[in-house]
Each structure stands twice: as structure tokens, then as C-alpha cells.
């Protein structure tokens, strides 16, 4: 193992450097991984410019959240992976403390709150995946034993799908049911449509404003996908969504990104049957105004979901291994690690089932 490796590091906003860094030995609960492919978030450029209100790791740090790689070495307390294993790296780390609200971070990106516990956890695991080698907490590593025959450029699609997978699990979607997906033409929303079909939904109401993208989802995933083209007119949108759902939707997942209005979100809620559940994973920039009278009269649930449960990556990988989910539907554009800055520009243009990755 080389004593140094190449990595991109953020030293300050607008100060990104590609440099040689020391290759560490794995901590007792850590794993050293050779990165094969790392996902580039669509808003990574804004993060690096300081335009997103995140609690960034202490600088300098290596950015980047999810990746596919191979284990170089595992710490002495790690038993579920060993050298040579193909693995999925998740950035979602919870502090292992006896607390009702344990600290949470997204490695290489942000702490969910600026508490002393969260910032200490982030300082310990600050570096992400845009490097030749990553040192990762074992708790955030999932072995991909049954998927070792697939290329990293295909497996990196797991990184795009894991967030909506967590949301779909929170909805409690059951086989044969109808689900409404709001923001279906977006980066995560399109993945939710793909996943809902794989998870056995009887009907997936794909809500969005881009007819061509919605039609492409139906063409790709079949007649169970029902496009619902909305305009922002609350009354008309509600009628369109209800009609597409056939009046039978019990659950909905909202993945609308950076929305200036919650009108469509409310239309999706109102399209649910009595006792329905709406799961929020989007990033609306305005409050969601709920009517207590409506909520009580309809026994609705509105819940937030941050990321996914710890076992979710293994469950998602199992869908692929069993042939229920074909990752090749995700359209991956790759760049060499040295071309990371070009990859960031490309990622900003992604929509639908696109994904940008850097490969080593």
C-alpha cells in the first residue's frame, strides 16, 4: 500500500486542490477502501462555493458522499468485510451514543446540526470519497458480495437510489398498492418511480411538470407508471392526481427539490384516501401549511424522513441481486478523478435518471 494517494481537498470556499495526502492506517472501527466510483451531487458546485447553508467539515477536507470501492484493509474490530471485498460506502453516520437524539453527519458534506457531539463526530470522519483512497467507518460500509460481477459504473447507481429507497420504506408501501411520487422528474424522484415499480407497487402516479420526462419513465418502466402532469393550479392538480391514482392511493412520497411553493405537495396529500400517509423528503424553501381540520377529518399522517435506516443499503442491494431492480436504467456519465471539476459542472445539468460519477 502506497504511503500517499491523490485526493481533492477543499481548503476554503473557491479553493479546491488536487494533492497528495497521507494514506492512513484503518482505525479499529474503520475500513480503508480503494475508491472505484464516487457519485457527484448535482449541487456540489454550490457546496464548494459556500452557497448552501451546510455545517461543512473542518477544512481542509475531502468532499464526496457515496461510492463503490474495494477494501484495502479493515480495522481490528471490523468483522463483516475484509481485504478485497467489493463494498458500498454510505455517508450517513449516526453517533454510537445512548441518546434519544444521537448526532448524525453526512461524511464529506455536512453535520445535520451544529451540536458539539455532531461536530466532534464530523471532525473524526471528515473526509469523503473524491480520492483514490477513503478511510470510512465500518458502520457505513455494506458488502456487495452477490454483485461482485457488476462494474462499479453500474453499481454506483445504488448511490442515487438509496435516498428514495429510504423514503419508500417509510411510506410502508405494500405490494399491489398505489403510490404517488411528487417530483418524479427530478434526480431522486425519478429513482423513486423506478424503485416503486421494483418493490411491487400496483400503480405509480408520477407527478411532475415535464411531460417528456414523465412519458419516458412510463415507456421505460411500463404501464404501472401513470404520469400526472401538473401546473401549480391547486384545484386542477388535485383532480389530475386523483384521476391518475384512481382514487386508491394510501401513500405518497414528496421528493420535490428546492420548491418555491408547496401547492403540489398539498395536492398530493389531498389525493390520499382516509388514513393516508405523506412522507416528506424534499427541500421546499417555504413552509407547508396544513389545515388541522382537514388532517383530523381524514386521519392523514405527514412525516419527515431523513436519509434511510442502517440496513437499507443491504436491502437495496438484495433487490438487485434477486433480479428485481436493474441498475442499468440509470444513465451514468463518468469522469476521471483528475477531471473532478468537469464532473461537478456536468452534475449540475443532471435530470431524471442521470448520474455523474468520478472513477479511479
Predicted regions and their residues:
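Glycine-rich beta-strand-centered segment in the early N-terminal region that forms part
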Residues: 24-39, 52-105
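Rossmann-fold dehydrogenase core element
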Residues: 277-279, 290-329
Amino acid at each position: 500500500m502506497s504511503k500517499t494517494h491523490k485526493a481533492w481537498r477543499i481548503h476554503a470556499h473557491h479553493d479546491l486542490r488536487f494533492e497528495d495526502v497521507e494514506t492512513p492506517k484503518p482505525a479499529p472501527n474503520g475500513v480503508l477502501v480503494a475508491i472505484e466510483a464516487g457519485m457527484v451531487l448535482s449541487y456540489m458546485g454550490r457546496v464548494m462555493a459556500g452557497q448552501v447553508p451546510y455545517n461543512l467539515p473542518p477544512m481542509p477536507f475531502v468532499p464526496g458522499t457515496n461510492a463503490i470501492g474495494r477494501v484495502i484493509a479493515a480495522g481490528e474490530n471490523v468483522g463483516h468485510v475484509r481485504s478485497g471485498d467489493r463494498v458500498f460506502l454510505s455517508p450517513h453516520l449516526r453517533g454510537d451514543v445512548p441518546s434519544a437524539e444521537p448526532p448524525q453527519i453526512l461524511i464529506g458534506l455536512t453535520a445535520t446540526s451544529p451540536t458539539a457531539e455532531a461536530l466532534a463526530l464530523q471532525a473524526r470522519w471528515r473526509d469523503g470519497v473524491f480520492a483514490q483512497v477513503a478511510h470510512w467507518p465500518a458502520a457505513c460500509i455494506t458488502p456487495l458480495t452477490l454483485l461482485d460481477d457488476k462494474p462499479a459504473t453500474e453499481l454506483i447507481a445504488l448511490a442515487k437510489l438509496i435516498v428514495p429507497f429510504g423514503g419508500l420504506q417509510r411510506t410502508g408501501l405494500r405490494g399491489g398498492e398505489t403510490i404517488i411520487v411528487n417530483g418524479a422528474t427530478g434526480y431522486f424522484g425519478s429513482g423513486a418511480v423506478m424503485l416503486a415499480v421494483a418493490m411491487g407497487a400496483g400503480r405509480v402516479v408520477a407527478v411532475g411538470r415535464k411531460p417528456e420526462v414523465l412519458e419516458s419513465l412510463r415507456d421505460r418502466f411500463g404501464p404501472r407508471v401513470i404520469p400526472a402532469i401538473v401546473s401549480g393550479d391547486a384545484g386542477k392538480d388535485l383532480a389530475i392526481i386523483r384521476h391518475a391514482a384512481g382514487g386508491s392511493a394510501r401513500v405518497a412520497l414528496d421528493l420535490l427539490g428546492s420548491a418555491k411553493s408547496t401547492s403540489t405537495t398539498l395536492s398530493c396529500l389531498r389525493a390520499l384516501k382516509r388514513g393516508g400517509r405523506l412522507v416528506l423528503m424534499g427541500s421546499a424553501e417555504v413552509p407547508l401549511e396544513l389545515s388541522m381540520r382537514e388532517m383530523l377529518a381524514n386521519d392523514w399522517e405527514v412525516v419527515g424522513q431523513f436519509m434511510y435506516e442502517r440496513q437499507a443499503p443491504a436491502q437495496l442491494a438484495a433487490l438487485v441481486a434477486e433480479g428485481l431492480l436493474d441498475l442499468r436504467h440509470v444513465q451514468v456519465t463518468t469522469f476521471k478523478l483528475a477531471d473532478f471539476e468537469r464532473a461537478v459542472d456536468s452534475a449540475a445539468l443532471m435530470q431524471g435518471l442521470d448520474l455523474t460519477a468520478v472513477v479511479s
